[in-house]
From Swiss-Prot:
It holds the Pfam family peroxidase. Its EC number is 1.11.1.5. Keywords: Heme, Iron, Metal-binding, Mitochondrion, Oxidoreductase, Peroxidase, Transit peptide. This is Cytochrome c peroxidase, mitochondrial.
């Protein structure tokens, strides 16, 4: 496999190097507690990590192969099993949320933001209200990054989401390496992610900005098959399904088949299921049941889990890749699940 030279706009790379922390402080952190001492870049067939002790930065080469990235995947998967002291016994849902939120800032009008820069590691993006609670995912991945310092933060966060979906029973997610960590100044503006209190028009506006059509929007919101909301983080509370650590199409089934009512409580307006009052739906979720075109796709996914898996895989892979300047010839990889 041919290794590459760091030739992607070397002058730009050199400027980024001046932003890199010193190699002697591998655990240095910003306000959010997760700035590692390596700035990683990946292109072609290899991954590079480098450090700067002076303006004249040194470059260290690591020729990472697919097998090396599989080791990162496996380490995340193993830790998901070993470290079960989190919501419903799994960090998987919050890893998916980290990957989703890191990528969902993309703006197709100027091809900026998205997962490429790994800027969720900095306080400005990490402190956006929509990202409350994601410190748990970043801290979960911190020892993985220390073990594999050559992988960029953007690649690690997105690979964490891929691992979560696959290890919790979801579809295989095609993935590409090559995200280049950017300095804090590259952080996206607040307000780029969906506001869960809104309706169909807002959903379309946010996802259209990223280049998604109605079908892709509905598939991506199906990520709510996993996890739960926390009042202290978002103002909403509860899981969407009875199996929040299993990736299924139950989200759509429950949304369309159950009866829902407004929850009477002191948090943000949300829906609860009439029968058990233990499940929740967000106003943006309910838009999938009330908007004619959204409902068409939600109904299709409720009836056919294989179709949902296929469409989610394609849409989520697209989301992870949006805004990334992959070197020409970068391969698309699929990783073998540990639970296979």
């Amino acid at each position: 496999m041919r290794s590459f030279r760091a030739v992607r706009n070397f002058s730009t790379t050199a400027k980024r190097l001046s932003q890199a922390p010193k190699a002697s402080t591998p655990n240095a952190s910003s306000g959010n507690g997760f700035v590692l001492a390596f700035v990683a870049a990946a292109a072609g067939a290899g991954a590079y990590y480098y450090y700067a002790n002076s303006p004249a930065a040194k470059v260290e080469t690591f020729n990472a192969t697919k097998a090396d990235y599989q080791k990162v995947y496996d380490a995340i998967a193993d830790k998901l099993i070993e470290d079960d002291d989190y919501d419903d016994g799994s960090y998987g849902p919050v890893l998916l949320r980290l990957a989703w939120h890191s990528s969902g800032t993309y703006n197709k009008s100027d091809n900026k933001f998205g997962s490429s820069g790994g800027t969720m590691r900095f306080k400005p993006e990490a402190s956006h209200a929509a990202n409350n609670g994601l410190v748990n995912a970043r801290n979960f991945l911190k020892p993985i990054h220390e073990k594999f310092p050559w992988i960029s933060t953007g690649d690690l966060y997105t690979l964490g989401g891929v691992t979560a979906v696959q290890e919790l029973g979801g579809p295989i997610i095609p993935w590409k390496r090559g995200r280049v960590d950017e300095p804090e100044s590259a952080s996206p503006p607040d307000g780029s992610l969906p506001d869960a209190s809104q309706g169909a028009t807002h959903v379309r506006n946010v996802f259209n900005r990223q280049g998604f059509n109605d079908q892709e929007m509905v598939a991506l919101i199906g990520a709510h098959a996993l996890g739960r909301c926390h009042k202290q983080n978002s103002g909403f509370e509860g899981p969407w399904t009875f199996s929040p650590t299993m990736f299924t199409n139950d989200f759509y089934k429950l949304l369309l088949d159950d009866k829902w009512q407004w929850k009477k409580w002191d948090g943000n307006p949300q829906y609860e299921d009439v029968k058990t009052k233990s499940l929740m739906m967000l106003p943006t979720d309910m838009a999938l049941a009330t908007d004619k075109n959204f409902k068409k796709w939600a109904t299709a996914y409720a009836k056919d889990q294989d179709l949902f898996f296929k469409d989610f895989s394609a849409a989520f892979s697209k989301m992870l890749n949006n805004g990334v300047d992959f070197p020409q010839g970068t391969e698309i990889w699929e990783f073998k699940p540990k639970n296979a």
